[in-house]
Amino acid sequence: MLQRIYLDNNATTRIDPKVKEIMDPFLRDHYGNPSSLHQFGTETHPAIAEALDKLYKGINARDIDDVIITSCATESNNWVLKGVYFDECLKKGKNHIVTTVTEHPAVRSTCNFLESLGVEVTYLPINEHGSITAEQVKEAITEKTALVSVMWANNETGLIFPIEEIGAICKEKGVLFHTDAVQAIGKIPVDVLKANVDFLSFSAHKFHGPKGIGGLYIRSGVGLTPLFHGGEHMNGRRSGTLNVPYIVGMGEAMKLAVEHLDYEKEVVGKLRDKLEEALLKIPDVMVVGDRIHRVPNTTLISVRGIEGEAMLWDLNRSNIAASTGSACASEDLEANPVMVAIGASKELAHTAIRLSLSRFNTEAEIDKTIEVFSQAATRLRNISSSY
């Protein structure tokens, strides 16, 4: 079988073998419903508690009860935005939300929905580096602002937003602060207390855990109307039978993610830089966004004169997986929203290719990718009508 190279780790990651190993007994032997009073149910409780302990410590929350299990970050994001709508907009008359133009569709689409209900949403523009400033947030906040929602790291460029500065402003103004940390956890340190975060969303499958499980950090003392109603699971905050094997897997994945942070910075970051520097030697290739303030695994490359989709499928034929942007929107074949937001032409914005590494990538894989990418760029430009 030909070697396959996976460089789409911002879309999803492979499960770490250690995560699979710790999940297996709960898929096979310890399958009881945790809410049941018999031993099949109660024997799962220690493992759930241990997993929650790993999760809250992984983001430096104060208490184990500050982390609520969800199905994914999309659910977590929806819960925060819609919960704030009920708690702040309807009950207190605060009908304003501040976010950015480059948020994940799970946030943007939910904000669009809330706008249809009469909520005013300010979408902060990004600068030429792909970022915003804390001052922009400060200027956007009004007496009617209920929530500020800004992602910790961008899913396409990897750029890190000034979360600590924004958190300090929100705390000073008495405004709730939410961050989608899906692309930050496992790549850089995430500290909810230091950042003054009220809500933080994450998904296990982005840091080598299973798909279909995620979480929401809710700062102690902050209320949030439940998105789901039913049983009294998670202290009545999120109904639904607890998915024990996936919770156990997510806890272990978080623990391993924190343990590998130095490796991400020193090894994965150097592999990304090697890949990037080699691709920049190809004529008319550029890196999109700030190359300094970003997570260590991600690069967004623009290859002038070549449609991103054409490059994507050429790489795919050589068994290399990459992306043109968010996996939740990439099938639409739209211009890259980050490139559009920084002012690139739609023609140029269609040339984006995202390459995102993980701790399981090797230097040999990067060398092979450089070779294949360079050959593909030459071949595709030879048949391009726009280069």
Swiss-Prot record:
Per UniProt, the keywords (alphabetical) are: 2Fe-2S, Cytoplasm, Iron, Iron-sulfur, Metal-binding, Pyridoxal phosphate, Transferase
The residues that the entry says bind [2Fe-2S] cluster are C328
Q: What does this protein do?
A: Master enzyme that delivers sulfur to a number of partners involved in Fe-S cluster assembly, tRNA modification or cofactor biosynthesis. Catalyzes the removal of elemental sulfur atoms from cysteine to produce alanine. Functions as a sulfur delivery protein for Fe-S cluster synthesis onto IscU, an Fe-S scaffold assembly protein, as well as other S acceptor proteins.
The similarity annotation says:
Belongs to the class-V pyridoxal-phosphate-dependent aminotransferase family. NifS/IscS subfamily.
- Residues binding pyridoxal 5'-phosphate: A73, T74, N155, Q183, S203, A204, H205, T241
Q: Which residues form the active site?
A: C328
What lineage does the source organism belong to? Bacteria, Pseudomonadati, Campylobacterota, Epsilonproteobacteria, Campylobacterales
Superkingdom, according to UniProt? Bacteria
> One MF term in GO for this entry?
cysteine desulfurase activity
Any one Gene Ontology biological process term?
A: cysteine metabolic process
Cite the InterPro entries for this sequence: Aminotrans_V_dom (IPR000192), Aminotrans_V_PyrdxlP_BS (IPR020578), Cys_deSase_IscS (IPR010240), Cys_deSase_NifS_proteobacteria (IPR017773), Cysteine_dSase (IPR016454), PyrdxlP-dep_Trfase (IPR015424), PyrdxlP-dep_Trfase_major (IPR015421), PyrdxlP-dep_Trfase_small (IPR015422)
Pathway the protein acts in: Cofactor biosynthesis; iron-sulfur cluster biosynthesis
Question: Can you name this protein?
Answer: Cysteine desulfurase IscS
Q: What is its EC number?
A: 2.8.1.7
- Record flagged with keyword Cell membrane: no
Q: What class of enzyme is it?
A: transferase
Q: Which HAMAP family match?
A: Cys_desulf_IscS (MF_00331)
Q: Where in the cell is it found?
A: Cytoplasm
Quote the PANTHER family the UniProt record gives: CYSTEINE DESULFURASE, CYSTEINE DESULFURYLASE FAMILY MEMBER
Q: Does the keyword Secreted apply?
A: no
Q: Please provide one cellular component term from the Gene Ontology annotations of this protein.
A: L-cysteine desulfurase complex
**N6-(pyridoxal phosphate)lysine modifications at:** K206
* Database matches in SUPFAM superfamilies: PLP-dependent transferases
Q: What gene is this protein a product of?
A: iscS
Its subunit composition reads: Homodimer. Forms a heterotetramer with IscU, interacts with other sulfur acceptors.
What's the catalysed reaction?
(sulfur carrier)-H + L-cysteine = (sulfur carrier)-SH + L-alanine
